[in-house]
Amino acid sequence: MSNGKITQVIGPVIDVEFEAGELPEIYYALKVSNPSLGDEPWNLVAEVAQHLGENTVRAIAMDSTDGLVRGQEVLNTGRQISVPVGRGTLGRILNVIGEPVDEQGPVETDTTWEIHRPTPEFVDQSTKVEAFETGIKVVDLLAPYARGGKIGLFGGAGVGKTVLIMELIHNIAKKHGGFSVFAGVGERTREGNDLWNEMKESNVLDKTALVYGQMNEPPGARARVALSALTVAEYFRDQENQDVLLFVDNIFRFTQAGSEVSALLGRIPSAVGYQPTLSTEMGELQERITTTKHGSITSVQAIYVPADDLTDPAPATTFAHLDATTVLSRQIAELGIYPAVDPLDSSSRILDPQVLGEEHYQVARDVQYVLQRYKDLQDIIAILGMDELSEEDKQTVSRARKIQRFLSQPFHVAEIFTGTPGKYVELSETIRGFKEIVEGKHDSVPEQAFYMAGGIDEVLENAAKMAS
């Protein structure tokens, strides 16, 4: 294979000319020496995105292009970007091209996989449906997660998406003991650092591989880092027959990075300035996240909602792929109820008596009915006051306010902020607690006793303390 020469540099995009008949294929990795990144030769990787004609390809750089000059030599590696996979990646932080960035030495593994891989064949996919317990009351009761499913955490800025993800990692590592892969896509470097330190302190780091392409990285890295992390997860699923958890924070940044490079690649923007290939790119990523006969990948994806607008093309395209949605609401966060999950807006495909059993389904529907009735009555209460309600409606409002407070829960990962020890609530306890509230067994208990409690027994202890 002959080497090429740089003919043009436009921000994160570089054009490279090769000799006739020597063009690298789409997605092949090219390497070039960038003195601004260090003295090592071939230290910048770029991925071929387009063939422009006249023996020229356009490639997206995975790191800074500052310092590149026209006429510089470019190496065709003859293969795609490949990342190390296997147990050697656990406890490590990798970047988009699979290099360790935690200063802990090289990754101890001999196997590397290319990051663009085919979707599992239809015959290899599993069709079994079962719920996946998280230990978080509002999730397990009202919008349960499916094993091997795709879950979206929707919310604007600062309502608690990252904290909820960290709590899930904590609960799953402690209770489930499986491997997790965390993809930090275009989020804050500080959060990435905090996550690593907290995982280390809570002893879950040795079960987790972290792959980061943070906010300060060029769009090429942010657009590909989710694929690198998914490849690490696929190895555990296909070769080690594991049930893997893949956390993506934040899937919106994957779309955003794609839109940043799309215009530079000469594509005409689509609605709201997004790339015309938005649904294709999203589909290629999401379809690889699935359960096969070997194992499963359950993915939890934080989805930033620009300006709290759920109809924006980025969140709307992601919706189509999800099995469950956990919607975080600013109104609920303002009430001081955390996790700020909206119990009426969040949904799940498996909220079905045939999957969960009749009792769980009935309690969930009863809780939703009480909360919806309270929501309907709020206009009347605001205009006329509580006194104008019928006795039955007053009772509904009282129960709804207790349910609302009982849906809050202290998190393990937030102990350092709140000083309250975190609680993992078993599903059977969650169902029992809400069933008793809906049936009116705790109508005499003050609503403040339900706030930030674990199970219903703790609520009764709180009430006894308040009474004494």
UniProtKB/Swiss-Prot annotation:
SMART domains: AAA. It is found in: Cell inner membrane. It comes from the Bacteria. ATP binds at residues 155-162. Pfam families: ATP-synt_ab (PF00006), ATP-synt_ab_N (PF02874), ATP-synt_VA_C (PF22919). It is an enzyme of class 7 (translocase). The keyword Translocase applies. Keywords: ATP synthesis, ATP-binding, Cell inner membrane, Cell membrane, CF(1), Hydrogen ion transport, Ion transport, Membrane, Nucleotide-binding, Translocase, Transport. It is a peripheral membrane protein. Belongs to the ATPase alpha/beta chains family. Produces ATP from ADP in the presence of a proton gradient across the membrane. The catalytic sites are hosted primarily by the beta subunits. This is ATP synthase subunit beta 3. The lineage of its organism: Bacteria, Pseudomonadati, Thermodesulfobacteriota, Desulfuromonadia, Desulfuromonadales. The gene is atpD3.
